[in-house]
Curated annotation (Swiss-Prot):
GO terms for biological process: arginyl-tRNA aminoacylation. One of its GO terms (molecular function) is arginine-tRNA ligase activity. The lineage of its organism: Bacteria, Bacillati, Bacillota, Bacilli, Lactobacillales. Pfam families: Arg_tRNA_synt_N, DALR_1, tRNA-synt_1d. Belongs to the class-I aminoacyl-tRNA synthetase family. It is found in: Cytoplasm. It comes from Streptococcus equi subsp. equi (strain 4047). Monomer. Its EC number is 6.1.1.19. This is Arginine--tRNA ligase. It catalyses: tRNA(Arg) + L-arginine + ATP = L-arginyl-tRNA(Arg) + AMP + diphosphate. A motif ('HIGH' region) lies at residues 121-131. It comes from the Bacteria. Keywords: Aminoacyl-tRNA synthetase, ATP-binding, Cytoplasm, Ligase, Nucleotide-binding, Protein biosynthesis. One of its GO terms (cellular component) is cytoplasm.
Length: 563
């Protein structure tokens, strides 16, 4: 039983007016550790007991069985609990040492699937920093879902269909060069895409031409299909090279085109249920009863289907294929209205499992405060950015540890980890301004700072030649180690919070906090001092390294043993 549950149970024994779960949720962590480890505010009982909170706190402190705590004291309207440091540190260290990387593994999911729609770059366009958020948030959530006992299914819903392919075909036929595209596919295709968009602003006939080519593509015209397939194949080769660099993999690459033959069923279902109504020649579903003002546009007046039709087909396919417990869409916040419509249409169709679908939205990445745009050519391309991050990491490693044996591998882990960590430490609904120098810094709240704390611990353990004995009980009771013990003990709850909120930043902030607490401990403690407490201190280091490495893994970030 963890300490919060223990305290809630003790209070519940003498306070029938509150449920144990309610007491648990009311417990606070005092800002000053001199005021105890946990505190119960008595305000919540004042009305029911018709007594002043101070009097209630005093009464509770006297009646609680204090034998399981170092001390229980009333301070004003709070009951403050001082935990038994030696006993709890022994329990925590024993658990972490026994479990290793499986510490805090949970079984809520019982092997059920969670579908994750993530990354989803557009074919024939460069993989930019704008795509990074969906990729790294989705990848981190997959690790967190697995830690909670679910089986994640990572789906790269490629943007491999749409009018933009009509634009690209027109541009290629007008100005393209096969050899140039084969040599540098994404660069060349981007140039063509930017050029056609610029020229279409003054020449509307290009839009018409593009629409015609896309119609031919929908009708499986041979020339259009061959060009489309070529653009897709060349783009995927390049994307997969980047995914390998990021350490991200997928279970499915079924993109928009995959659902071309699955949309007629959606239209038939909507017709059969009497949900499709005509509006200005188009087919729509009214959603006013869900508080959604604009109807969902299912089919345009020219017969073309829309994103939502395709997403309805995808949702049905995924439910049938994976029978998901949850289905999440890691897509920018600007698509919020689309996903509200998607869920509402499925609900209207009678699919209550639409309640298990969540739009995991996120804010924008900017550069110098300006929004990034592929169409306008204002992009930060991921590949040169990753190369620059690795180079900067290599320079810092060279300065700190010139004799390091595997510098290239470590520089890669640090550079890539720095970019991913910086993104993930930001609350996902907030955007951030891209700043490579800040990302790769070894100081401050960064990935390299956390990685360096882990490498420092490994160095200490190597110097001491320490491996903990599984039949030994290690315990500590000094204030610095206690801060670390409390964080390690809280790790299972941190994972659950990150899971419940679809929020990797909770995990990233925990990793920063644990690294900071260890560095403070390292600065104030002679860890390798040859005294009776030495093995206890080393056991704490060992457990901290396990949890730091696991927290980083849940973020998709490596933890080098040397830096």
């Amino acid at each position: 039983m963890d300490t919060k549950t223990l305290i809630a149970a003790e209070i519940a024994k003498i306070v029938p007016e509150l449920e144990q779960a309610a007491i648990f949720n009311l417990l606070e962590t005092p800002k000053n550790s001199d005021m105890g480890d946990l505190a119960f505010p008595a305000f919540s009982l004042a009305k029911a007991l018709r007594k002043a909170p101070q009097a209630i706190a005093s009464d509770l402190a006297e009646r609680i069985d204090a034998s399981q705590f170092e001390k229980v004291a009333a301070v004003g309207p709070y009951v403050n609990f001082f935990l038994d440091k030696a006993s709890i540190s022994a329990q925590v260290l024993t658990q972490v040492i026994a479990d290793g990387a499986d510490y805090a593994q949970q079984d809520e999911g019982q092997g059920r699937h969670i579908a994750i729609d993530m990354s989803s770059p557009n074919i024939a366009k460069p993989f930019s920093i704008g795509h990074l958020r969906s990729t790294v948030i989705g990848d981190s959530l997959a690790h967190i879902f697995a830690k909670m006992g679910y089986k994640p299914v990572k789906i790269n819903h490629l943007g491999d269909w749409g009018k933009q392919f009509g634009m690209l075909i027109v541009a290629y036929k007008k100005w393209g060069n096969e050899a140039a595209v084969q040599a540098h596919p994404i660069d060349e295709l981007l140039k063509l895409y930017v050029r056609i968009n610029a020229e279409a602003e003054t020449d509307p006939s290009l839009d018409e031409e593009a629409r015609e080519w896309f119609r031919r593509l929908e009708e499986r015209d041979q020339e259009a299909t061959e060009l489309w397939q070529w653009f897709r194949d060349e783009s995927l080769i390049e994307f997969n090279r980047l995914y390998d660099q990021l350490g991200v993999s997928f279970d499915s690459y079924n993109g928009e085109a995959f659902y071309n033959d699955k949309m007629d069923e959606v239209l038939e279902l909507l017709e059969d249920k009497g949900l499709l109504v005509e509006s200005k020649g188009a087919k729509v579903v009214n959603l006013e009863k869900y508080g959604i003002e604009h109807p969902a546009l299912i089919k345009k007046s020219d017969g073309a289907t829309l994103y939502i039709t395709r997403d309805l087909a995808a949702a049905l396919y995924r439910k049938r294929t994976y029978d998901f417990a949850k289905s999440v869409y890691v897509v920018g916040n600007e698509q919020a209205a689309h996903f509200k419509q998607l869920k509402a249409v499925l609900k209207e169709m009678g699919y209550d499992w639409s309640d298990d679908m969540t739009h995991v939205a996120f804010g924008l990445v900017t550069k110098g405060g300006a929004k990034l745009s592929t169409r306008k050519g204002n992009v930060i391309l991921l590949e040169p950015t990753v190369a620059e991050a690795i180079s900067r990491a290599a320079n810092q490693i060279e300065a700190k540890n010139p004799k390091l044996a595997n510098k290239e591998a470590v520089a890669h882990a640090v550079g890539v980890g720095a970019i991913k960590f910086y993104d993930l430490k930001t609350d996902r609904m907030n955007g951030y301004d891209f700043d490579l120098e800040a990302m790769v810094s070894f100081e401050g709240e960064t990935g390299p700072y956390v990685q360096y704390a882990h490498a420092r611990i490994q160095s200490i353990l190597r110097k001491a030649s320490f491996t903990p004995a599984t039949d030994t009980s290690y315990s500590l009771n000094d204030p610095e180690s206690w801060e670390i013990i409390k964080l390690i003990q809280d790790f299972p709850r941190i994972i659950k919070r990150a899971f419940d909120n679809f929020e990797p930043s909770i995990m990233a902030k925990f990793a920063i906090h644990l690294a900071q607490s260890f560095n403070k401990y390292y600065a104030h403690t002679r860890i390798l001092e040859d005294d009776p407490e030495r093995d206890n201190r080393l056991a704490l280091c060992y457990a901290t390294a396990i949890v730091l490495k696991e927290a980083l893994r849940l973020l998709g970030v490596e933890a080098p043993n040397e830096m």
